[in-house]
């Protein structure tokens, strides 16, 4: 039994670890590190036409400081050389600025990614070595997103609250940089050939979807193989549901775009809406997702696929995905770090307070997921979990209307874990 602690981009401020650079001092007196665009490390999509760049410099001698910088930008990292940089060469610029320095190079939708590096001069005019390359993505324009329709689970085919959507991507040559853009109304997770893409959870971040929705960009180059590739998007309602004013459909929806870099140019890979299939996942929502009624998740273990591998997905019942006409929505790149699991906690105490009723004390208040393995139960047997941050009277927890239910499959190895809600 364990608890996943989540870092919420909308609630917590990340404390970044100090970077230890002392071992590098013997080789150079000026070490450039922590290159960022719009305060993000290598963002694959930004939501601005005027990006700003930042870097930090470690000096071996106290009192040294930057007196000038030079930035190179190019369409490929191999072009980050003076005379070759095809997007920008700032030349030597006299300035001590190293935070949110304006990018003044070429920036067009035809160049999905911009690679850049920087070097600096100290107060004595001594230059540093060039930094390691960084990159940022230009992203998808509002006009491009408006050309696509949302897809989701058909309204009358079953439970639409947490569906799987599946299609095939054909790849003729591996190794080409390939970016996947996902604009979901609700949460999403991405799987390619059975493997989860990235370590982010509860994506995208929270937004008021009647004003704007967010999209995430994934570098899926390393996940693709030559031939046919299985792409699965697992959706959850999150903040997009009928109990909230902008929930115009009873189920999450998604738009997807794919682009690949080949022979010096970016090409869009078409994924037609009619190629998508959808199935129930075994997960569904509980509660109203309103203050003091955020509920949780219901997991029907018998309906959850054993894995995201093709052999297990093929056992599900698939329907053609529904195309959904939606109100015109502003679509923006998510300009915050994603939610990730940052710690795993184990209970400090487990108390049986009645027949088949236990209190699990995690030892601290938390924001996160709950996970545990169950013994073999009878098919359809239900386990209910309720969550609170303190006891009310003795061993009675304070009711906060946060709860999950698990319906056993009757097989060995049943496991509960949250996916599209948290407590």
Positions of PLM-derived features:
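Extracellular/oxidizing-compartment recognition motifs
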Residues: 30-113, 117-423
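Bacterial N-terminal signal peptides
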Residues: 11-22
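N-terminal secretory signal peptides that target proteins for export/translocation
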Residues: 1-8
